[in-house]
Amino acid sequence: MSILLNIILAISVTLDSFIVGKSVDKKIKFTLISISFAHVTLFFIGVKIGDQIGPFVSNFDHWISFIVFLFFALSSYKDLISEEPVFKLDNTLKILLTTFALSIDAFAVGASSQHEIQYLELVIIIIAVSAPVFCYLGYKLKNEMIKHSHKLLYFSEGTFFLIIGSYILYSHISGGY
């Protein structure tokens, strides 16, 4: 795997941090540290024990990712037409649980692609930096778009998740990573 693919892998593992950022109102510094720590730790553990669990994870990790992103897309589209209050991460326990749940894909990617990663230190550094960056982008983008149109935020977010999920499924079906 070339250095460019290692970089893309690291960034793609952390894109879901955007979700946490858009859901948090307070404790953003704590959230940024938590999201970075969870992604790096779970990715590193996945890389280290990938040989033991790789055969179990690699057969269905793309399907789980697709279903998760499809769920997020449908949830965003539901919020587009609904006037219900949006789920907020407003306490430490919710932040930690959501951060951990959304970091599990880092574990699966680390476990299933450990032999293709040639620049492990670089990948870990990029994950440590990009997870809080995407989280902060979600936080700031949500605040800016709500000022103008929260409906546009839901539509954009849903479409983004649908594209990512579809690409993951297409990649799996076509035999790619």
Description of each model-found segment:
Residues N6-K26, E83, K94-I117:
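Generic transmembrane alpha-helix signature in multi-pass membrane proteins
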Residues K27-A38, K88-L96, H150-T159:
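Cytoplasmic-side transmembrane-helix entry/capping segments in multi-pass membrane proteins
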Residues I28-P55, E116-H148:
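A small-residue-rich subset of transmembrane alpha-helices
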Residues S12, F43, V47, V68-K78, ...:
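Alpha-helical transmembrane segments of multi-pass membrane proteins
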Residues M1-L15, N59-V68, L120-V133:
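Structural signature of hydrophobic alpha-helical transmembrane segments
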Residues F44-D51, I104-H115, L162-Y177:
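Hydrophobic alpha-helical transmembrane segments in multi-pass integral membrane proteins
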Residues S17-K29, A73-V86, C135-H150:
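C-terminal ends of transmembrane helices
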Residues P55-S82, S149-Y177:
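Selective transmembrane alpha-helices of multi-pass membrane proteins
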